[in-house]
Design a protein with these regions (language model features):
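Conserved beta-strand-loop surface patch within small alpha/beta domains used
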Residues: 21-120, 129-184
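Hydrophobic alpha-helical targeting segments used for export or membrane insertion
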Residues: 14-18, 22
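Mature extracytoplasmic domains of secretory-pathway proteins
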Residues: 122-124
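Compositionally biased, intrinsically disordered low-complexity regions used as flexible
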Residues: 1-2, 113
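N-terminal Sec-pathway targeting helices
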Residues: 2-15
Length: 184
């Protein structure tokens, strides 16, 4: 074997050895960190939700509620977290005094769990007229009252019903939209 060929073989073996060594290393903390978020109280690590899935029943309920009331309504999203997705099976009514629901504000009397709803993965409320459907003021990182409210809740997601779509947010404070019409 010629000297040039031996040199190429040594380089190839060294490269394979380094590749194998790197493959055995644990994942970068930065990469792992980006897939997890802190809970509302800042003590627990929870997976970042990247997808919100509404059942047909939940979509129908939201459409009916939105059309039925000139004031904000609030519901408890009942379901489960599956990996990086939250699956909402149904929307249960939140415990709200009628006098605590106006066209621009809704305040529950008690938490979803205290009202008897187990399996709550988030809270959803409406914005009649589909206005101001955001968790941050446009072009800023300044949280609206909805963003501030979500930050103090323990749930992985929060949502705003805005006519033909739902605006929602996850623990990473990333705001997303979901059409109300089921994707077929």
């Amino acid at each position: 074997m010629s000297e040039g060929r031996r040199r190429i073989v040594r380089i190839a073996v060294a490269a394979l050895g380094l590749t194998a060594l790197l493959a055995l290393q644990p994942e970068s903390a930065r990469l792992v960190e980006s897939a997890w978020a802190r809970s509302a109280d800042g003590t627990t690590r929870v997976p970042i939700v990247r997808k919100l899935i509404l059942s047909d029943q939940a979509r129908r309920f939201l459409a009916l509620q939105y059309r039925s009331y000139p004031t904000e309504f609030m519901g408890c999203m009942i379901g489960e977290t599956r990996g990086s997705a939250v699956v909402v099976r149904r929307i249960a009514p939140a415990d709200v005094e009628p006098s605590h629901s106006t066209a621009t504000r809704v305040v529950p009397h008690q938490t979803c769990e205290d009202a008897g709803w187990s399996g709550t993965v988030g809270v959803i409320h409406s914005h009649p007229g589909g206005e101001r459907c955001w968790y941050y003021f446009p072009t800023t990182q300044v949280a609206s009252s909805d963003g501030q409210s979500f930050a103090s809740q323990p749930y992985p997601v929060d949502a705003i019903m805005c006519g033909d779509h739902v605006v929602w947010i996850n623990r990473n404070m990333a705001e997303m939209q979901l059409p109300l019409a089921a994707e077929r």
